[in-house]
């Protein structure tokens, strides 16, 4: 009897995962995340130079970040633009240098284009969450401006704090010396989880549960790390883009990677948004199942006052059918 109930609970668990995946698949098809990712990739490439220009300007305003600007650039390009990071860094730094020499009107235009990217991200994620209530123009602009100005500062502060922790003498001890390479290797993964978690909790214009956002962030971060390694391996081992495009190969490589990155970001958002929908549906189904199965549960337990969980009810049904 106990073994049958345990097997039934395992079946319920895997069946629940399967039903969630089916629900997620329907959501992905309905939301057309491939089209959304393409739109965001286009806006990202259009806004890339303005975003970098604004970011570097914000970091330059704080003397503490001037000495580590090269480290910040290297960390970003190495971990977020695999296989083409060095080439892209050279071009973007040149473009940013040219952009910084522009007039006040030109710099204002760069800020507007950078805000366009943040606005596109905001609209895409809120559409995934089926958010009906929109933010006011003042609130939306304030949030975009805060992300644009405080975002680079927070990233720089995180890297400074990480560098400080790594330089502590505590890591020089023999017992902890082996932990340093592991910590450094896991640092990009930790940053990815933190960034996705913040994105999924702050951007939607509704309350998002921490555990749901954490699940989506972990899945997105894992896919992002695997995607970086897989894409870098493909570009280096199968240089078809270089054979076709020659010196212009960097352009399609960057576009494809940005597109894949947005697919991963939106997939994590879909997982986060689908969790409460699925759990609410399962809860209502469990209540109905428990109500219909009460006579069977009473007959099996011999106690009319017993309260059974949905898994126990399902298990008892399976036992009753087998008997």
Swiss-Prot record:
Membrane topology: Multi-pass membrane protein
Top-level taxon in the UniProt lineage: Bacteria
HAMAP family, alphabetized: UPF0761 (MF_00672)
Keywords, sorted A to Z: Cell inner membrane, Cell membrane, Membrane, Transmembrane, Transmembrane helix
Keyword Transmembrane helix tagged: yes
Pfam families: Virul_fac_BrkB
Organism of origin: Shewanella baltica (strain OS155 / ATCC BAA-1091)
Residues annotated as transmembrane: 4-24, 45-65, 102-122, 137-157, 182-202, 213-233, 247-267
GO cellular component: plasma membrane
Family (UniProt): Belongs to the UPF0761 family.
Protein name: UPF0761 membrane protein Sbal_0315
Compartments, record wording: Cell inner membrane
């Amino acid at each position: 009897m106990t073994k049958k109930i345990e097997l039934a609970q395992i079946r319920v668990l895997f069946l629940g995962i399967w039903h969630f995946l089916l629900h997620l698949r329907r959501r992905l098809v309905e939301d057309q995340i491939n089209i959304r990712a393409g739109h965001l990739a286009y806006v990202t490439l259009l806004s890339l130079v303005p975003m970098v220009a604004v970011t570097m300007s914000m970091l330059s305003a704080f003397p503490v970040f001037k000495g580590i600007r090269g480290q910040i650039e290297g960390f970003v390009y190495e971990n977020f633009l695999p296989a083409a990071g060095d080439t892209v860094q050279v071009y973007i730094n040149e473009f940013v240098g040219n952009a910084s020499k522009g007039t006040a009107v030109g710099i204002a235009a760069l800020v507007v284009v950078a805000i366009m990217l943040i606005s596109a991200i905001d609209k895409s994620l809120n559409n995934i969450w089926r958010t009906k209530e929109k933010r006011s123009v003042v609130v939306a602009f304030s949030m975009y401006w805060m992300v644009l100005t405080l975002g680079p500062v927070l990233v720089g502060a995180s890297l400074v704090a990480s560098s400080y922790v790594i330089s502590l003498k505590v890591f020089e001890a023999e017992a902890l010396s082996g932990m340093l390479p592991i910590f450094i290797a896991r640092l990009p993964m930790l940053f990815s989880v933190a960034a996705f978690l913040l994105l999924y909790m702050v951007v939607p214009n509704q309350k998002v549960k921490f555990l749901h956002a954490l699940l989506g962030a972990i899945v997105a971060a894992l896919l992002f790390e695997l995607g970086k390694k897989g894409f870098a391996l493909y570009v280096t081992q199968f240089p078809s883009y270089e054979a076709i495009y020659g010196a212009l190969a960097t352009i399609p490589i960057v576009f494809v990677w940005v597109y894949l990155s947005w697919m991963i970001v939106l997939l994590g958002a879909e997982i986060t948004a689908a969790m409460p929908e699925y759990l609410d549906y399962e809860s209502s189904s469990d209540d109905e199942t428990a109500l219909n199965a009460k006579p069977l549960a009473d007959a099996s337990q011999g106690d009319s006052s017993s309260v059974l969980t949905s898994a126990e009810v399902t298990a008892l049904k399976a036992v009753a059918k087998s008997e």
